[in-house]
UniProtKB/Swiss-Prot annotation:
InterPro entries: Actin, Actin_CS, ATPase_NBD
Polar residues: bias regions: 302-317
CC annotations in GO: H4/H2A histone acetyltransferase complex; Ino80 complex; NuA4 histone acetyltransferase complex; nucleus; Swr1 complex
Protein's UniProt name: Actin-related protein 4
Start and end residues of each stretch annotated as Disordered: 289-317
Protein family: Belongs to the actin family. ARP4 subfamily.
GO molecular function: chromatin binding
GO terms for biological process, alphabetical: chromatin remodeling; DNA repair; DNA repair-dependent chromatin remodeling; regulation of transcription by RNA polymerase II; transcription initiation-coupled chromatin remodeling
Compartment annotation: Nucleus
Origin superkingdom: Eukaryota
Alphabetized UniProt keyword annotations: Activator, Chromatin regulator, DNA damage, DNA repair, Nucleus, Transcription, Transcription regulation
């Protein structure tokens, strides 16, 4: 590979940070990604695909909404490649042939996905060099930490990882598929229990003011969209509710707690007051199955299905595979798996990131819960108040990492890729640890 691609001054590297909900793309060394795209596409029966908010948010008859990334892993590579190419060529206005690309990956990314990522970089995007960086390590670097315990709460995954001297420790890694989208599911069930149907914005032609608790007075457009598009838009309403109404109590929530009610207006103009639900729904992140205030019965542990749906133990949903743990328990499991000698360093460098961690009260509650678990320890939580730093942590870390002068020796060149045609996984495991 030529020195131009190693140097970093002549040609800027590009950083791609794919997530289940958002994909961030930008230039190495910058402090914010140039392009943040939904990790979804609008797909038509003739094979056409649309990307970007301005296209997939607009209703189109027959357009299916597809997400190529599930629980942090790429599942549909055709869609993923088109998404990355759209971001690079249409948004960044760059030619991937001219830029080395650092791409982030979760620590538990399957070996076959790692190989496929490498092949995609060289065969589909045809970049001159690439590197696969752990998202957990990158997020720690974004906070200036080489050793840390990372609490990452995203859309589909909650993970706690121990990072020591820049490497994620296998034995301390904890992850489960219960996070922001699961909170949406619980909100959806809460509204169904109230016999309330969410009408997303695209269906509302006009609306008139109504009193709180009264049915909407609106004119709806005829629906000619697919179920996947409709549900995609409904999820956006749930996300808005979380941003406006959801609160996480600084102590375990009790039904006896006095709650200030908050009004939420739905897209069709209907207005609803939310009281205890503001705390009850996100409380599941810390105490899964915390429904005592709803049904006057002891809470049942939440189970996780193979389809990553959420149910109660007595639900009709079958094929449950694992019990959901609260975030403090995930954290405790992570620390207990690590060597005693490094635990103090981990506890003194707890980093919080991920979009779901931005819910009001999250960091304080985590601080209180961990202080109870480790009363004699020097506990320090680093939770940036900047939305970009918290949401884009792994991209920012990748930007920092790839801009270091010492990083040039880590790039995998096209020549190396071609030389390891029979065993590319070995190349990845040797270089991208």
């Amino acid at each position: 590979m030529t020195s131009a691609f190693y140097g970093g001054d002549e040609v800027s590297a590009i950083v791609i940070d794919p997530g289940s909900k958002w994909t961030r793309i930008g230039f190495s060394g910058e402090d914010i990604p140039k392009c943040v795209l939904p990790s979804y596409c609008g797909e038509f029966s003739d094979g056409r695909r649309l990307f970007g908010e301005e296209y997939i948010y607009k209703s189109n008859p027959g357009m299916e909404i597809k997400n190529a990334i599930r629980n942090g892993w790429v599942e549909n590579w055709d869609v993923t490649v088109d998404l990355w190419r759209y971001g690079l060529e249409q948004q960044l206005k760059t030619n991937p042939l001219e830029h080395p690309i650092l791409i982030t990956e979760p620590f538990d990314n399957p070996p076959e996905n790692r190989v496929k990522t490498l092949e995609t970089m060289f065969e589909s995007l045809r970049c001159p060099a690439t590197y696969l960086a752990k998202q957990e390590t990158c997020a720690a670097f974004a906070s200036g930490k080489g050793t840390a315990c990372l609490v990452d709460i995203g859309a589909e995954r909650s993970s706690v990882s121990a990072i020591y001297d820049g490497f994620v420790l296998q034995k301390g890694y904890q992850v489960q598929h219960f996070s922001g989208n699961a909170i949406n599911d619980i909100l959806a069930q809460t509204l169904r229990d109230k016999n309330f149907e969410v009408m997303p914005k695209y269906l509302v032609k006009s609306k008139n003011p109504v009193e709180i608790g009264q049915p909407a007075n609106c004119e709806l457009r005829p629906r000619d969209t697919t179920d996947s598009y409709h549900q995609f838009q409904v999820q956006r309403v749930y996300d808005e509710w979380k941003e406006e109404c959801a609160l996480i109590s600084d102590v375990p929530f009790s039904s006896e707690t006095t709650i200030a009610e908050s009004e939420f207006e739905f897209p069709d103009g209907s207005r609803m007051m939310f009281g205890a639900e503001r705390y009850q729904i996100p409380e599941h992140l810390f105490v899964p199955g915390s429904d005592e205030e709803m049904n006057e019965e002891p809470s049942k542990p939440i189970e996780q299905t193979e389809n990553n749906e959420v149910s109660q133990q007595d639900s009709s949903v079958t094929n449950t595979s694992s019990r959901i743990l609260g975030i403090p328990q995930l954290f405790q499991n992570c620390i207990s798996e690590c060597d005693v000698d490094i635990r103090a360093s981990l506890l003194n460098n707890v980093i919080v990131c991920g979009g779901t961690s931005l819910m009001q009260g999250f960091s304080l509650r985590l601080q209180n819960e961990l202080s109870k678990l480790y009363p004699g320890s020097r506990l320090k939580i680093h939770a940036s108040g900047h939305v970009v730093e918290r949401s884009y942590a792994s991209w920012l870390g990748g930007s920092i990492l790839s801009s270091l002068g010492t990083f040039h020796q880590l790039w995998i060149s096209r020549q190396e890729y071609e030389e390891h045609g029979s065993d590319r996984l070995a190349l990845i495991e040797k270089r991208c640890k």
